[in-house]
């Protein structure tokens, strides 16, 4: 295995989904403009200044748009849960040269994807004209339900015990 000794910056936040409270750690890619200095009494929330960085190939056909929207959905979920407000995507060509940069506000991504007019025509990723938009709120509700199930079903009497959950996509089809 290759070791990465590059320093990483992480943040830890307390959040909740439904009645479940979570403490989540996340790597932060960069700070947009400045990082408030909490040691000096700055009361501003540092999360407001954090940014997630992504790269993507230039979108030049329906399948690449479909792949990008799925990537943006996964990035949205990560940033939404932690509270990172901005995502910056660099679009590169086939020679890995950066050609354009787009900024996205995390909270606006569900509407952006839902209102994508290209999604509603017959060319969206080769799935026969079926509108295939990521389900943002159902995904969060599923996570909340799953965490509630875990909370109810995993015994809390032995904190040293590890649990392994498995999902078999072959037996758990829609």
Where is each model-derived feature located?
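Accessory terminal regions of nucleic-acid processing enzymes
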Residues: 1-174
């Amino acid at each position: 295995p290759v070791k990465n000794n590059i320093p990483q910056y992480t943040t830890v936040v307390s959040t909740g989904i439904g009645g479940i409270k979570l403490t989540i750690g996340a790597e932060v890619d960069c700070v947009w403009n400045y990082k408030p200095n909490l040691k000096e009494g700055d009361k501003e929330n540092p999360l407001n200044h954090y940014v997630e960085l992504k790269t993507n190939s230039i979108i030049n056909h329906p399948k690449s748009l479909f792949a990008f929207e799925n990537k943006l959905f996964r990035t949205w979920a990560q940033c939404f849960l932690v509270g990172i407000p901005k995502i910056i995507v660099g679009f590169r060509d086939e020679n890995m040269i950066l050609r354009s940069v787009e900024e996205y506000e995390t909270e606006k991504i569900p509407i952006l994807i839902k209102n994508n007019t290209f999604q509603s025509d017959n060319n969206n990723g080769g799935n026969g004209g079926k509108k295939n938009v990521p389900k943002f709120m159902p995904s969060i509700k599923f996570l909340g339900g799953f965490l509630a199930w875990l909370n109810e079903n995993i015994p809390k009497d032995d904190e040293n015990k590890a649990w392994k959950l498995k999902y078999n996509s072959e037996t758990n089809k829609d």
